[in-house]
């Protein structure tokens, strides 16, 4: 079985692998669509904590066809078309019982692809606990839409959930890469009234406006905090979602956040051990400003609800895809694109049908 793997630090290449055994509750799938993520880039070329295992296949964003199921699987059969969530936890753990399935064995370990086993950039791949971790692909949801639901949509929307956005809230969205754009779309669907997006690339600005951004703050045009405060008549924003940025982003978010506001962060600060916070913007700890950051939950129920939003026309996740490929081997080129991030890129994807 061939797959695209992290051979060692900074080396991406093809390997032959053996799949994990299909247990009684598991499934074996073959990809119909795949997309690389910034997390894959971190794993190969960065400082990601998820895995440093050699010769491990990367990838955790896919839609697929079920090839084989274990004899205890009830709701899926060979031939079914499915969305494969990026987060496929072990649901038989205490953290899962407590509502944190994404951390089933410790921080972020619900992303079992790459963390514990080969990922989805292979001719076939293994999915644990299929009834809980696969989602049926609705007939009227395209492969392009579905592969963006598997990680980008669920992660971005989680930022809006963490921020507890309420109808009428003014929201600042830091970062308009693929996750940031999904955070923005999540804010729109949750009822934000005035959405301010921070970013500069024209291709992303266009999609940000289509997803509901009312104002765009370009950090090349001046201080980000000053621009947001000007757009809100000095009041600041009720909520902030962070889907992109750098070490300084959290302090900027605190600076524009009203007293009592909430920040929802899904940005992975790769390689940054210490994140600075401006004490004054946090009221030196007394401003009742809440910082919440996390990995999105996983599993079937969440995927199927998100797919409903797409199926019934509330939202089109496929707008993220700017570079599309059609051969299995093209996933390597897509990975390099995701690493290099040309200005006309939001998200590459490989669509095999």
Question: What are these regions, as identified by a protein language model?
Answer:
Residues 209, 214, 246-314, 352-353:
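Glycine-rich phosphate-binding loop and adjacent beta-alpha segment
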Residues 83, 238-241:
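N-terminal Rossmann-like NAD(P) cofactor-binding module of classical short-chain dehydrogenase/reductase
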Residues 90-174:
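NAD(P)H dinucleotide-binding glycine-rich loop of Rossmann-like/cofactor-binding domains
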């Amino acid at each position: 079985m061939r797959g695209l793997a992290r051979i060692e630090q900074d080396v991406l290449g093809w390997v032959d692998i053996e799949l994990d055994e299909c247990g009684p509750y598991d499934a074996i799938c073959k990809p119909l669509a795949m997309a690389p993520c910034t997390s894959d880039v971190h794993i190969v070329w960065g400082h990601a904590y998820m895995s440093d295992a050699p010769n491990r296949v990367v990838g955790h964003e896919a839609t697929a066809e079920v090839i084989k199921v274990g004899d205890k699987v009830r709701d899926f059969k060979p031939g079914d078309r499915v969305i494969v969530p990026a987060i496929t936890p072990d649901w038989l753990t205490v953290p899962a019982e407590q509502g944190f399935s994404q951390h089933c064995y410790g921080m972020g370990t619900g992303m079992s692809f790459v963390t514990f086993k080969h990922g989805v950039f292979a001719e076939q791949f293994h999915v644990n606990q299929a009834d809980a971790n696969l989602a049926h692909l609705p007939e009227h949801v395209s492969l392009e839409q579905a592969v963006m639901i598997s990680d980008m949509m669920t992660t971005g929307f989680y930022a809006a959930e963490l921020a507890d956005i309420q109808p009428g809230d003014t929201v600042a969205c830091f970062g308009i890469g693929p996750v940031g754009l999904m955070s923005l779309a999540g804010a729109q669907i949750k009822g934000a009234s005035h959405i301010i997006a921070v970013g500069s690339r024209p291709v992303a600005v266009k999609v940000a406006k289509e997803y509901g951004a009312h104002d765009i703050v370009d950090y090349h045009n001046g201080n980000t905090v000053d621009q947001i405060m000007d757009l809100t008549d000095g009041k600041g924003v009720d909520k902030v979602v962070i889907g992109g940025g750098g070490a300084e982003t959290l302090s900027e978010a605190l600076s524009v956040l009203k007293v009592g506001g909430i920040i929802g962060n899904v940005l992975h600060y790769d390689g940054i051990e210490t994140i600075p916070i401006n004490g004054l913007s946090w009221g030196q700890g007394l401003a009742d400003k809440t910082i919440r950051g996390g990995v999105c939950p996983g599993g079937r129920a969440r995927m199927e609800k998100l797919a409903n939003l797409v199926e019934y026309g509330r939202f089109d996740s496929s707008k993220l895809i700017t570079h599309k490929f059609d051969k299995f081997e093209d996933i390597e080129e897509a990975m390099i694109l995701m690493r290099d991030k040309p200005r006309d890129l939001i998200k590459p994807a490989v669509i095999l049908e």
